[in-house]
């Protein structure tokens, strides 16, 4: 009975279907959709990807030309020994005054030599620098310079009252030793680092100073730092800035720090050297440099309109006709961020800020009348467009999007020189900065491609002035934190101890309660999966031969996405 009933229902449905005025033919609908998709692909997708290929190849060639130019300049500098002290006048401070005094009057000669030392301000901006505050303060207070001709200024924006107390006591300790050190705080953090530096220049004692040496909290200059840098400013009135090289105390801590060392060594050894030698301009690195105060005033002082106040000041100073000199022989020890979280925040600031500054100053640069046409072209094209925009965008668009997408589109052909030869030459040009890490080049390139996702998002944010454009997160420094031994009871609590007093201060528990899903970086995971799928498609269908690159690049995205890079903070 149930079967006959079921058969009757089926017959009724068939009768009603047959009476419909328009019969739905699913195969025809599918064919229509396929035809529409093919038409859209031919009319929109393929031309768009071809345009991206052309733009990517053009930008890659621009970057190659810039790297070859930098390499040629640095080769010439080394071949002809065009050191800074051969291009500019350099004499030891006080030597001329001492020589001019009577040889019979040794005391008057020493007095004259001491008087020849200019007044120097040493600024150290800080923000909750619990692990490293003693490093820069101790190094600054140990600089070889007449004690009555230098002022150490600690600009503490800390919000942690315990840290504030520690920093103030450290300043008082050095003050008790006869060092002219000033501990300065302000009521708010307006303008972040730029605001602190600007506020620091308003004190009356600064009016007596001619030059400013700047160090971040983790930087440790050698005692002869001022003796080797200030003479360039004293004997060359056209020089506004002397920038020195960073040297990293924790470069061998993990792969993340090794990769950073490779990138920054190239930046200092080649990019800064070339800019100084040819154009007398480069981007101020924000620390380990000495400024002429008159040049800062002439450029309009510190501005907090972007997160790269150091680059902002440098560009405005060079547009006023001032020159910069890079002294690579002087190295200042510093710390690299060893956690991926800290590194991401730093790279966001370093990518977003320049793009935002370029947008604000592109017209001003072209309209400037005080610098030569070629200097304006270098500033606009080489420094900003190629160095800060193209380099941050083409890496992701080309290697992480265009090449994987081309696997799915047989109509797209990328020339071999654009896939192999040009990228190889660019990589080799950059890898020479750290010969000891040459065996890590492939891993370094893969990691840089992964970071390009973060950098392109930051650059777009800067250009559009959206979202986190003015976000300032101080780069976390671990100091010796990773060497801290766990408590005897097995807990993760860490007591903050003043190593000189050897008595605990206010104990502060640091508990890691990060939810496991907060550790992952989902955009990197998504891109990694897409690239690996493209690799499988290439193996099975496309046969373009990109699959080896796609597999290892996708794996690199997944490794970073699952946070298997850097060290775990204590």
UniProtKB/Swiss-Prot annotation:
GO molecular function: glucomannan 4-beta-mannosyltransferase activity; mannan synthase activity
Annotated active site: 157, 310
UniProt topology in membrane: Multi-pass membrane protein
EC number(s) recorded for this UniProt protein: 2.4.1.32
Family annotation (InterPro entries): Glyco_trans_2-like (IPR001173), Nucleotide-diphossugar_trans (IPR029044)
Function: Probable mannan synthase which consists of a 4-beta-mannosyltransferase activity on mannan using GDP-mannose. The beta-1,4-mannan product is the backbone for galactomannan synthesis by galactomannan galactosyltransferase. Galactomannan is a noncellulosic polysaccharides of plant cell wall.
Protein name, entry field: Probable glucomannan 4-beta-mannosyltransferase 11
Species per Swiss-Prot/TrEMBL record: Oryza sativa subsp. japonica (Rice)
